[in-house]
């Protein structure tokens, strides 16, 4: 890079800098190539960072509130990232005010609304059209072996499925909170399974009550052992929960993530009757700027 681009750092899905999932945000990535953006993401070391540029023609949205957004992990570009979307929306909300935003992502168009809530900003993203699919028994067995999870440790009420709401995630439900807490997996073996199935994370879930869940997301394909708060997976899980009849057509779910990592986060998932898309919301806070490039 020949010019300096300010790299903002925000944590998403928590108002506490020590909680949630940190993301890099570059509000003006014009002039940056793919290698530049990957280098910034790798230098930061966060699970993903977001890079904004001018919107494509015909995207819609209010002038100055529509953008092209690309997401990079330390290892590769990803089609969509929920927590970096929330972080970006909070950063924009602080600069251009609350209201509606429109993001053009590789996964599709993602509307985001930023609102004020008790003095804090809250961002709500609406996913692209979600869907779920079965996973082959052999692929499931390989994923469980990589996790060192015996099949009897799964919750039979929540069957394994691959869920998509911008990125693909394998949903596996633990029968107990203890099972969820005990996570020591084979990084390379799980990464190989995930690459073969084109998965972004494996979403490990434990159901505390009707609408409250605890989740963990291994992310070896991004070069990260575990993601502290995964908005894209939360959206995919909302679609999964509705499709298998776990929750009604209209529901609000609370997902607790990051607790076992010491970075607690809260993700709110909203399902609306008559709308197959999923809304994922959370707060965020700035961690401080740094510079990238020379």
Functional labels for PLM-detected ranges:
Residues 1-80, 86-294:
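Active-site proximal loop and beta-alpha junction motif in alpha/beta enzyme cores
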